[in-house]
A protein has these predicted regions:
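N-terminal secretory signal peptides that target proteins for export/translocation
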Residues: 1-2
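A residue-level marker of the well-folded mature domains of exported/periplasmic proteins
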Residues: 25-397
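Sec-dependent N-terminal signal peptides of Gram-positive bacterial secreted proteins and lipoproteins
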Residues: 5-24
Length: 397
């Protein structure tokens, strides 16, 4: 075969291969199969927010709803492993899981199916797992918590001015799920936001030891109100706390979704994550056949976090303008949520802090978290690692 003929055949073969690659990419978009393992279902805010985010990402990428398989109400037990295996056996190309306790079970499945991408929300172990197909993702929700705290602080000021209570009685109640860093980071950010506009504010935190239990969250909110808390917020997944607030006439700030439908006369706003940001990122990489980072975290500047609509008839005058000001300051980097000049620990300013534990002994051993005078949250990994107990916040039984 002469060289000219060989070159022509080689060129034709290259063109054919290029068409096959393009065709495969197009088919992948139409045939990709996605799994989502959920701690709850569409009836609770946290999971509903994930479902809505995945649906939005799929719609934007031209992926049909029939290509997504959901595993609802999956507990943080061996059931999560079984769900992951079942999704893998059903041919999923990428599997997402949305609860902290799913992680070890999902990554166990990732070891068995290296050709499938496993993406876990709120977890901490992907980078240390050594698995190229294991990923953690979260968002800088502490930024939105801070903004929601500003909304709350302005409401406290309004109620103080109206004579409903004194400045010294401006006590916030916070219904937390577990005493984990994820929750601690959130309630601390919320408190700092509130105190930035209402300096006399204090806060009590009560844990339910459950991510989503409507009755326990309602009871916790009721107990905090009975203990003198005049505004309630939450890091818990149901409408339990807002329901208690609506019955008691106490203002509240929610999480995940707007709580105005559940508490139209008391809900101010909610801090929320735009999960579509990550779902789109991960799906685009899977569709392209590209490997992607083990950790992902984005915030206000990327549109990954926000506060839901303000209850205009209830929030204090000037709240919308203040929110816009604070959001812009966070985006342009002139406001750092965990500025060490704004809080103390046992009366002392924090100048150094080891970020988090890598060997499981619950003693932080990796990474300096204090950078340029602020605690740099979710930089060394996607999940929060703010573990400080700052002055002004008290835990209650």
């Amino acid at each position: 075969m002469n060289m000219k003929k060989f070159a022509s055949l080689l060129l034709a073969l290259c063109m054919l291969l290029s068409m096959v690659v393009v065709a495969n990419a197009e088919v992948a978009a139409n045939e990709i199969k996605i799994g989502l393992i959920c701690i709850g279902d569409e009836n609770e805010g946290y999971t509903a927010n994930h479902i809505n985010g995945l649906r939005a990402a799929c719609a934007e990428l031209g992926i049909d709803a029939s290509q997504v398989i959901y595993k609802y109400n999956t507990p943080e037990t061996e059931a999560a492993y079984e769900a992951a295996i079942d999704l893998a056996e059903q041919g999923c190309d990428v599997i997402f899981a949305n609860s902290f306790g799913h992680e070890s079970y999902v990554f166990l499945a990732a070891e068995e199916y290296p050709e499938i991408e496993f993406c876990h929300a709120t977890g901490t172990g992907a980078s240390a797992s050594g698995l190229e197909n294991a990923h953690n993702f979260f968002a800088a929700i502490y930024e939105a918590r801070y903004v929601a705290g500003v909304v709350a602080g302005m409401k406290l000021n309004e109620m103080i001015a109206e004579g409903k209570f004194t400045a010294e009685q401006a006590k916030i109640g916070y219904v937390g799920a577990f005493p984990f860093e994820e929750v601690k980071s959130g309630y601390t950010a919320f408190y700092l936001g509130a105190r930035s506009v209402c300096p006399s504010a204090t806060m009590e935190v009560k844990f339910t030891n459950s991510w989503g239990d409507l009755a326990l969250e309602k009871e916790a909110a009721e107990a905090l109100i009975a203990n003198g808390c005049v505004l309630i917020s939450q890091h818990a997944d149901t409408t339990g706390a807002p329901t208690a607030c609506e019955a008691a006439g106490v203002p509240c700030v929610g999480y995940n979704i707007s709580m105005i439908p559940a508490a139209p006369n008391t809900a101010l706003t909610s801090a929320a994550i735009n999960w579509a940001s990550y779902f789109k990122f991960a799906l685009q990489n899977v569709l392209a056949g590209e490997k992607f980072a083990s950790d992902w975290c984005q915030g206000y500047v990327d549109g990954a976090v926000y506060i839901t609509e303000l209850n205009e008839g209830l929030v204090a005058e000037g709240t919308a303008a203040k929110v816009a000001e604070i959001e812009e300051a966070i985006k342009n980097g002139t406001l750092h949520v965990f500025n060490t000049a704004t809080f103390t620990v046992k009366g002392e300013t924090v100048t150094t802090c080891t970020a988090y534990d890598t060997d499981g002994d619950y003693v932080p051993d990796f990474g300096e978290a204090i950078v340029d005078g602020y605690f740099a949250e979710s930089v060394l990994r996607s999940a929060p690692y703010f573990g400080l107990d700052i002055d002004g916040i008290t835990m209650v039984e």
